[in-house]
């Protein structure tokens, strides 16, 4: 078998329904749109959330809360991503960006504790979860809190 000979299993794929192509197809004449009316027209139908003139749900419910403009957004990574560094390396957000562990810095980097770390590293300038800090120290590394 070659790549160009691959085919889906028989019966696993069905052709799309072609509407408005004759009565013999079962979807001719009105093409599944019923008789006249708004929904039978081209571009017909109502917008999402429209309830026929009744006060819609999104307007019946009260407004609540606000978006805090001072929220800090951190890029998160797990400790197992730090195994790419050599023993004794000082890991900073700038180094993580340079080595493409993170794609952007936003308001900083937070290291979470998922996975295991085998290297002895010094972490500087990053926020850490409690588990991540414990794992880094247990591996012989140091944590300099931001």
Curated annotation (Swiss-Prot):
Transmembrane segments: none
GO cellular component: cytosolic large ribosomal subunit
GO biological-process terms attached to the record: translation
Molecular function terms, GO-annotated: rRNA binding; structural constituent of ribosome
Coiled coil stretches, renumbered: none
Gly residues bias: start-end ranges: 21-31, 42-52
PROSITE patterns tied to this protein: RIBOSOMAL_L15 (PS00475)
Segments for region (Disordered): 1-54
Keywords: Ribonucleoprotein, Ribosomal protein, RNA-binding, rRNA-binding
Stated role: Binds to the 23S rRNA.
Classification via HAMAP family: Ribosomal_uL15
Family from the record: Belongs to the universal ribosomal protein uL15 family.
Quaternary state and interactors: Part of the 50S ribosomal subunit.
Stated name of the protein: Large ribosomal subunit protein uL15
